[in-house]
A protein has these predicted regions:
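Loop-to-transmembrane helix entry/capping segments in MFS-fold secondary transporters
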Residues: 32-36, 131-140
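Central cavity-lining transmembrane alpha-helices of secondary-active solute carriers
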Residues: 38-63
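Glycine-rich segments within core transmembrane alpha-helices of 12-TM secondary carriers
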Residues: 44-50, 135-160, 176
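C-terminal ends and interior cores of transmembrane alpha-helices
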Residues: 74-97
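Transmembrane alpha-helix termini and helix-breaking/packing motifs in multi-pass membrane transporters
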Residues: 89, 93, 151-167, 222-233
Length: 246
């Protein structure tokens, strides 16, 4: 059960980034501006993740509640994440560029609250698993992540059966609730020791790593878009000539 949520959140992001986000960006902004809209959404989402994850993870290390250190973040984060998914499902109006702003706000909401749940959740392995078993636990985490990515990627083949993009979002909602419920109900946190004095140097190091990771993610997404639509995407996002064409 410890790795179940990794499947849910990996499925969640794979389906959004591969299926719903590109489709909705095209619907909202139209073919002419879909690259610009998609690039803007991805860049803002990466920035939100870069800022939120390390601070939330560090904060969850330092709080003490009757329900544990991580569970409150998972419950609140997934609940708010689900509300954001509902907004993403129903906000966009095809061909109406004015709905791009509320869509970006909803996407930022989902990105932030998913980090609220996922950053503390990622600390459950060192919290719960003895050092000699962490390799196995990490292997299960990797397996569930790959399965989630795979299932999220092929969900597009089921869009007709699911009723389109809205149905995909409701499937993601169910997956997130099931993953969070499995963790909250069946994974018991140990009593936490008193927190050590806060180390700002460590936080600065983590922020640096997340910053480079976010920049890398933005670059990889841009390159992926270029390869898929070489005559459209780069010019729409950056307003430059596509040097990758031909």
């Amino acid at each position: 059960m410890l790795s179940l949520y990794w499947f849910s959140t990996s499925f969640h992001w794979a389906a959004i980034l591969i299926i719903t986000l590109p489709s909705q960006a095209a619907q909202i902004a139209g073919d002419e501006f879909k690259g610009r809209g998609l690039g803007l959404i991805l860049a803002i989402g990466a920035l939100v993740s870069m800022i939120a994850a390390p601070f939330i993870g560090a904060y969850s290390d330092r709080i003490r509640t009757r329900w544990g250190r991580r569970v409150p973040f998972i419950v609140i984060g997934v609940t708010m994440n689900v509300l954001g998914l509902i907004a993403l499902a129903y906000i966009p109006r095809p061909g109406d560029y004015a709905t791009l702003t509320p869509y970006i706000i909803a996407f930022m909401w989902v990105e932030f609250w998913n980090n609220v749940a996922s950053a503390p959740y990622s600390a459950l392995i060192p919290d719960l698993v003895p050092p000699e078993q962490r390799g196995s636990a990490s292997g299960w985490m990797g397996l569930m992540t790959m399965l989630g990515n795979f299932v999220g990627g092929v969900t597009g083949l089921l869009m007709g059966m699911l009723g389109g993009i809205t149905g995909v979002y409701w499937l993601l909602i169910v997956a997130m609730i099931v993953g969070a419920a499995g963790t909250v109900l069946f994974v018991k946190e140990p009593l936490a020791p008193e927190p050590k004095p806060f180390n700002y140097r460590n936080l600065a190091g983590v922020m640096t790593v997340f910053g480079f990771a976010a920049l890398g993610a933005i670059g990889l997404n841009a390159l992926a878009l270029i390869r898929v639509a070489p005559n459209d995407t780069l010019a729409k996002i950056f307003g430059t000539v596509n040097c990758f064409d031909g």
